[in-house]
């Protein structure tokens, strides 16, 4: 039996400790053999000073804080002296206040109570009892002494395992008039001597008590919610809480408290919650899994338990059908994010421990959250196999999602999972933490607008996949959000193959309208829900994007999103029970002629796709149908770079000064022609035909030196928003769009089918891969014109410049005669004799090539500034323009301290797209960017090599 100290109990006096020692109390200072700390009440005679911070006199001269004001009459007639409003009133039902000791000068540097409060208190003549009067632990004090000793030892273990500046304190239950309350007074805690304000915050926490059986957040507080729900709760920053959710908010702001984690503590059987461990930090915290793991191991060492961290062996999913579905989902996420510049898209999948997939027999992935509320029931966890991050700044939010799960009705994704359809919210930051557990991270990473849709795949039957898209925070206008939402739906529709809406409603049925739920968080913790229809231009070539609009439908109110029935409102406004119906899906046929396509050649492919109402991937597929494998304006830049390099090489040769003028090149030198269609070129009058070339070649690559139309200057494409860095979670293969401009030999050779009809029909499944363009075309007016004598034997150039222009290797192949010395006569370039054409491109002598190779020009020996991003790190260095890919990877690996074979590198090209550097030719093209653009820095993106989707098993990964 845990007996109280006789002398202390008899005299009511305790030995006076120093205040500094108490502020920095450690577990080593605890008397484990002493009495239960709340079994006695320390008093002094009226002539002595108060000796302990936990002592509060019961005299009227020093009234007790409202914290301790408990009525013996069941909670009637309470008045308190707090500065809060109606939200902080003591519940008339519970009669238990959970407010701070706001006016006690020993603890707080705040001002004295207002005159109005003193008047009210005086008017009621209410005498507060002693704070510890009648506060005793439950009946089994023997058990409590053992538990307290174990908790003390567990905190000692935790202190040894962490080096962070953290306050760890225990909240234990006590009883008052049959009520269970939580207090940290007299309980063990650990605190670094350099607490940075945490010691004062510890003293503030001593003045708080929280109810564990109240319905009010004010009375429950963070420890009360965790104790009552037996679930952990954590936040990156307590300042994202409201004062109702976190009653110590003012003190947290004052003492710079940020990250907080509260974990329930269970007895060895795991059935009963016996307390709460609270970890408090002065810095923001995103990843709490390591701290949870340390606390759990410390508790396990003393035969106690907490929320289990999922460190068991990773569940493998050997299910080819599911991997096929995830591969298709990844393609949809990729295209949508790239097309509409969304910062993040991810996939949530329902997970139930021990359940089996409907098809294939593989085990479903266990929930990655350390919140144990999902045990035995369905919740949603993010999958690391189908997510796409465009903005590298939101990786922290993505990582936080891995530590959380969502139940039905929580957040936008939870609502979409609940109704089996789609859900949209304009501001997810208005939710409280119970409505959306990730709301604090959304505030932290400035994510506001979210859209989610629940899909099923024919590969996996009834398994649901909830796709969650976050819209750019810069788009705040409702109409702009609606337009973007319609465009997202169009893009998704065009790339669906096996996917369908889980509710059975097909895209585009009922006159191109889709019904979905719009939710809005209300101040009273309710959710306002309404069903609206969006009209989207699924036949996008005939409709304008501005036709996308929302059609209001009758409002559906929801106050309990988790338990409400699943109803779907039809377009007619009649709410019916959802019935899953299998409907035959058809492909929308779209037609674009080559004449229409040519009108957009001067601009970028993205601008053309937007103007025509399609996504860039569909635009690429249309181009391939016409035999156009590379968008013209993209190739113009590479052609110009190649001509510039050609000019430098020629000028570096002795004896050619004034013999060749490359500064007067005109657009007419390099026309865009088509060898199999009669489409008229740009700016030509109606009915005119392009001149026929002698020796007509059916190859798509043609050069002409005689007649060709002029092409207006194209507007350069604007770069994406600042700091956007793109990366994928899987290897870019197996049905995902590939990067442009990769090394030789990795292009997809598609059969070119002659298309005699200038109007074509697109149908069937969308193309998964888009090879680098190889179509030659007009060069902008900023290009150069070669003299006719140089172009006398233009057949030698045919196909070379366009196929892979821009790399030094191809430039040497393109113009071998550029490497010659003074042994060559000037008449080789300028002779008017017809025979000169035969000798113009004769292979140079080996000695001449050797001389040039040994004496590179100064431009070839220049250095280039590289700025590379890897996760949260950015490195900057310089390399020689003649470096190879292995030298680049060695430099990156040396600075990032990673292995050279564990990552891939991409560069930001002229079209602001991330292109994979797969070989030396890619690197040389990358290093030429500063010469052709305004920037002086080459930007690289380093990302880890991830598992290929083609593998047989999926790994969930460990936290």
Curated annotation (Swiss-Prot):
The keyword Transcription regulation applies. Disruption phenotype: N-starvation phenotype. Smaller rosette, but no effects on roots. Delayed growth and flowering when grown in greenhouse. Increased drought resistance. Residues 578-659 form the RWP-RK domain. GO terms for molecular function: core promoter sequence-specific DNA binding; DNA-binding transcription factor activity; transcription cis-regulatory region binding. Signal peptide: none annotated. Gene3D superfamilies: Phosphatidylinositol 3-kinase Catalytic Subunit, Chain A, domain 1. GO terms for biological process: nitrate assimilation; response to nitrate; response to water deprivation; stomatal movement. Expressed in roots, stems, leaves, flowers and siliques. Detected in root hairs, emerging secondary roots, vascular tissues, leaf parenchyma cells and stomata. This is Protein NLP7.
């Amino acid at each position: 039996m845990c007996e109280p100290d006789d002398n202390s109990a008899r005299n009511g006096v305790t030995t006076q400790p120093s205040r500094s020692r108490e502020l920095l109390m450690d577990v080593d200072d605890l008397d484990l053999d002493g009495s239960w700390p709340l079994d006695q009440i320390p008093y002094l005679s009226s002539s002595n000073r108060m000796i302990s911070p936990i002592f509060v006199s019961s005299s009227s001269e020093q009234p007790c804080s409202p914290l301790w004001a408990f009525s013996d009459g069941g909670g009637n007639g309470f008045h308190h002296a707090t500065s809060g409003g109606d939200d902080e009133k003591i519940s008339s039902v519970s009669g238990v206040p959970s407010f701070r000791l706001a006016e006690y000068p020993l603890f707080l540097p705040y001002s004295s109570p207002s005159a109005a409060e003193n008047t009210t208190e005086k008017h009621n003549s209410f005498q507060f009892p002693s704070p510890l009067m009648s506060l005793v632990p439950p009946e089994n004090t023997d058990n409590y002494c053992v538990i307290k000793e174990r908790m003390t030892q567990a905190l000692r273990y935790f202190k040894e395992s962490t080096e962070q500046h953290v306050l760890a304190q225990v909240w234990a239950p006590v009883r008052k008039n049959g009520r269970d309350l939580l207090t940290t007074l007299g309980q063990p805690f650990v605190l670094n001597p350099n607490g940075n304000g945490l010691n004062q915050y510890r003293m503030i926490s001593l003045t708080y008590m929280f109810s564990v059986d109240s319905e009010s957040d004010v009375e429950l507080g963070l420890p009360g919610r965790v104790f009552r729900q037996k679930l952990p709760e954590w936040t990156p920053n307590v300042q994202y809480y409201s004062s109702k959710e976190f009653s110590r908010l003012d003190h947290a702001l004052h003492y710079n408290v940020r990250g907080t984690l509260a974990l329930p503590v269970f007895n060895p059987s795991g059935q009963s919650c016996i307390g709460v461990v609270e970890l408090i930090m002065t810095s923001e915290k995103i990843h709490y899994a390591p701290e949870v793991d340390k606390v759990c191991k410390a508790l396990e060492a003393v035969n106690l338990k907490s929320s289990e961290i999922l460190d068991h062996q990773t569940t493998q999913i050997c299910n080819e059908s599911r991997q096929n579905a995830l591969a298709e989902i990844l393609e949809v996420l990729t295209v949508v994010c790239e097309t509409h510049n969304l910062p993040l898209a991810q996939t949530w999948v329902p997970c139930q421990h021990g359940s089996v997939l409907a098809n294939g027999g593989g085990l479903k992935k266990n929930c990655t959250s350390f919140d144990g509320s999902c045990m035995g029931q369905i919740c949603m966890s993010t999958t690391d196999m189908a997510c796409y991050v465009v903005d590298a700044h939101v990786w922290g939010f993505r990582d936080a999602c891995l530590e959380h799960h969502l139940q039905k009705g929580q957040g936008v994704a939870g609502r979409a999972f609940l109704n089996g359809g789609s859900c949209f919210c304009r501001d997810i930051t208005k939710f409280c933490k119970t409505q959306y557990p990730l709301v604090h991270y959304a505030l932290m990473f400035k994510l506001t607008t979210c859209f989610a849709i629940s899909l099923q795949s024919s590969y996996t039957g009834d398994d649901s996949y909830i796709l969650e898209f976050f819209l750019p925070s810069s788009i705040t206008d409702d109409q702009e959000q609606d337009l973007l939402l319609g465009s997202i739906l169009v893009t998704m529709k065009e790339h669906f193959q096996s996917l369908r809406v889980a509710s059975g409603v097909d895209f585009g049925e009922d006159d191109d309208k889709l019904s979905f739920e719009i939710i809005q968080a209300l101040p009273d913790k309710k959710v306002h829900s309404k069903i609206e229809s969006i009209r989207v231009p699924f036949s996008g070539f005939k409709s304008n994007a501005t036709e996308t609009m929302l059609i209001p439908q009758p409002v559906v109110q929801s106050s309990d999103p988790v338990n409400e029935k699943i109803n779907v409102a039809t377009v007619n406004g009649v709410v019916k029970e959802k019935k899953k119906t299998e409907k035959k899906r058809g492909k929308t046929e779209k037609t674009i002629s080559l004449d229409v396509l040519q009108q957009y050649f001067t601009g970028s492919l993205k601008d053309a796709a937007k103007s025509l109402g399609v996504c860039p991937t569909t635009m690429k597929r249309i181009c391939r149908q016409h035999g156009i494998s590379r968008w013209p304006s993209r190739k113009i830049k590479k052609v110009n770079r190649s001509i510039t390099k050609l000019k430098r090489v020629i000028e570096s040769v002795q004896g050619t000064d004034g013999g060749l003028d490359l500064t007067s090149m005109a657009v007419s030198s390099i026309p865009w022609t088509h060898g199999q269609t009669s489409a008229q070129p740009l700016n030509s009058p109606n009915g005119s035909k392009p001149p026929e070339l002698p020796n007509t070649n059916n190859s798509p690559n043609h050069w002409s030196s005689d007649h060709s139309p002029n092409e207006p200057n194209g507007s350069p494409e604007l770069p994406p928003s600042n700091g956007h860095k793109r990366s994928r979670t899987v290897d870019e293969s197996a049905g995902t769009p590939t990067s442009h401009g990769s090394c030789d030999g990795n292009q997809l050779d598609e059969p070119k089918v002659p298309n005699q009809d200038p109007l074509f029909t697109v149908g069937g499944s969308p193309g998964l891969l888009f090879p680098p363009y190889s179509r030659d075309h007009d060069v902008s007016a900023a290009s150069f014109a070669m003299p006719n004598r140089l172009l006398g034997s233009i057949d030698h150039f045919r196909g070379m410049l366009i196929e892979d222009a821009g790399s030094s290797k191809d430039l040497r192949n393109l113009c071998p005669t550029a490497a010659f010395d003074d042994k060559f006569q000037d008449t080789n370039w300028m002779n008017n004799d017809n025979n000169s054409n035969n000798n113009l491109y004769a292979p140079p002598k080996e000695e001449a090539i050797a001389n040039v190779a040994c004496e590179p020009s100064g431009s070839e020996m220049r250095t280039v500034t590289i700025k590379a991003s890897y996760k949260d790190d950015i490195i900057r260095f310089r390399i020689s323009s003649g470096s190879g890919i292995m030298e680049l990877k060695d430099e990156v690996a040396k600075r990032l301290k990673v292995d050279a074979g564990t990552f891939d590198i991409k560069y930001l090209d002229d079209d602001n797209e991330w292109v994979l550097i797969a070989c030396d030719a890619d690197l040389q093209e990358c290093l030429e960017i500063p010469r052709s653009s305004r920037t002086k820095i080459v930007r690289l993106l380093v990302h880890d090599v991830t598992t290929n989707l083609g593998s047989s098993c999926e790994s969930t990964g460990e936290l």
